[in-house]
Amino acid sequence: MTGLKVDVDADEVGFDPQRLQRIDAHFRTYVDDGRLPGWLVLVSRAGKIAHLSTYGQRDVESALPVEEDTLFRIYSMTKPITSVAAMMLYEEGAFQLTDPVSRFIPSFADVRVYTGGSSGKPVTVPAVEPVRIWHLLTHTSGLTYGFHYVHPVDAIYRAAGYEFGAPPGMDLAAACDGWAALPLQFQPGSEWNYSVSTDVLGRVIEVASGMSLDRFFAERICSPLGMTDTAFHVPEAEQDRLGALYAVPAGQHEKVRHDAMGRTATRPPRLLAGGGGLISTAADYHRFTQMLLGCGELDGTRLLGTHTVAYMTRNQLPGGVDIETYGRPINAETGSKGIGFGLGFGVVDDPAEVKGLCSRGEYHWGGLASTAFWVDPAEELTVIFLTQLMPSSTYPIRPELRQLVYQALVD
């Protein structure tokens, strides 16, 4: 999608223009002192872009600037798109949210749960209830990520080759069978843990729809919404627009270029990762957030019903508790106190517990390379921040962005 531009004066939609400039002034320092390579920020209200700015470089070594059409690896900002895809199928009657995952992935019929022992000799018991589609959408399945480095099951994932993604050459179907053979961290539905659940959900989408995940995204979501640059890899003709990927290694303070991981975006992946595989642009993701703000509809194209979007963006954790209370808020991308979890989104339930400017009912997520977005229905506000620095916990970009956006609202 091209033609991204500011299309309303900020003061016409309740912003103080001078206060909005504080966003740019603050994040310029991140580039000037070398913490970030470059960034793009987009702030929209009532469907109109009120603030759009770029700064720094998409490729530091080649001195190429961040531009409005720069392509970014959005990593876990893929998850909301996968969740929307699943709920589109749910609306069509393809499954119930309570259906066992084993209906679509038979290897999930006999999962076992870790109860003790070591990562080398785990003690397990059968799952009391099946892993259900609802558990995948809410990250309450008991699955995990190998890169958490917290629980013995995390180490079991790493030993099996699942630290980041899956072993080379493995496709999504095989990865799901591999994950099903490993112990769950807890009984399904009993805790929250950020995990490969959304990748498994991607496989459910494939089986339920009879389409590969990339085809489903392209035909059912991206094409209808005009998201022309969003895909699982960047075509050769567009690769000069792709930002380089940087990382701050553990125990260090300086960012380094990470081409080994970054260059995977330039070729079609064997594993279509609904949990983190997409590359996109600010314009495309803006279209996606506007569809959400429009309760499932954008420019006459409806992907979801209004009640479905409302349900997805409501805290689904039992008793209305937050992520901090219900489970293991490791790598929750955007915080855990005062924040519940819906069907694919973190949801602000208690702004006082968040201890920062925000709105009740705002929903959001982020990605491994420090990207972030949120949708605030109460303020008709959407915000997108794109950069390419791993891990996302390196700097407090997301809370700082929140406070700088909300302090500029004056109506």
Locate each region found by the language model.
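Active-site SXXK
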Residues: 24-27, 47, 73-101, 198-206, ...
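Short, conserved phosphate/pyrophosphate- and ester-handling motifs at nucleotide-, phospho-/glycolipid
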Residues: 16, 79, 281
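Short, surface-exposed loop or secondary-structure junction motifs
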Residues: 2-3, 110-357
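Short, conserved catalytic-motif segment at the N-terminal edge
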Residues: 4, 11-74, 94-96, 110-122, ...
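Acidic helix-start/capping segments at beta-turn-to-alpha-helix junctions
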Residues: 102-109
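Short clusters of small/polar residues that mark proteolytic maturation junctions
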Residues: 54-56, 260, 387
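Short glycine-rich, acidic/polar surface loops and turns
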Residues: 344, 360, 365-375
